[in-house]
Amino acid sequence: MWFKVFVGDIMKFIEVMEKRHSSRDFKKDEVSEDTLREIVKIACMSPSWENSQPWNVYIATGETLEAIREAWIAENGKKIKGSADMNPGHRTNFSERGQKNMADFMDAIGKFDDDEDLENFNHVQHILFNSPAVVYLTLPKNYTKWSVYDLGGFGMGLMLAATDLGVDSIPAYELVKYPYILRDNLPIPEDEDIIMGIALGYESDEHINEYESPRLDLDEILKIN
């Protein structure tokens, strides 16, 4: 009996992992506050270094998010370069394999979409993917690398919780590249760095949402000795 229950739980988790993918355009349907709270509550079960739980979470919805979106569109329209609190670095800072994967991703997007779709792909980023809610994850300034690791686990837990509750998501640098706009509209203090944004909502029927990026073969990343 225990074995059957255990296998059932594992299969459910695998299904959630397989279902989660980056949704690049959302419907206007709102995500209820109760659902948002439940998503974050589940993510709070994530582990951290000596239970430090270094994360803080801010969610923009409604008029607040629309004010952010309007300012975002204006900055993008002026081609203002992003200046995120956590420097993303240059592509050359990534490993050769990482650089190849990123190049392959952009090439695949170009082949997947026609010119009109590709233009929409770029446009929806600048309007925050049309999302009705954006989660912003922060860390105290002078955070350690372990805290970044912990926050990554928290973010993944949050997206898996969202998936399990029927809510789609996408984590993106685009969502945090103008931190001054976020601080103008959210109670994020200067002694916290805005590390990542995760858009939440319900996926639209746009063609771009059909794209799913491939994963490396297991033997390319795994060594068992």
Positions of predicted regions on the chain:
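Acidic, surface-exposed loops and disordered segments
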Residues: 2-225
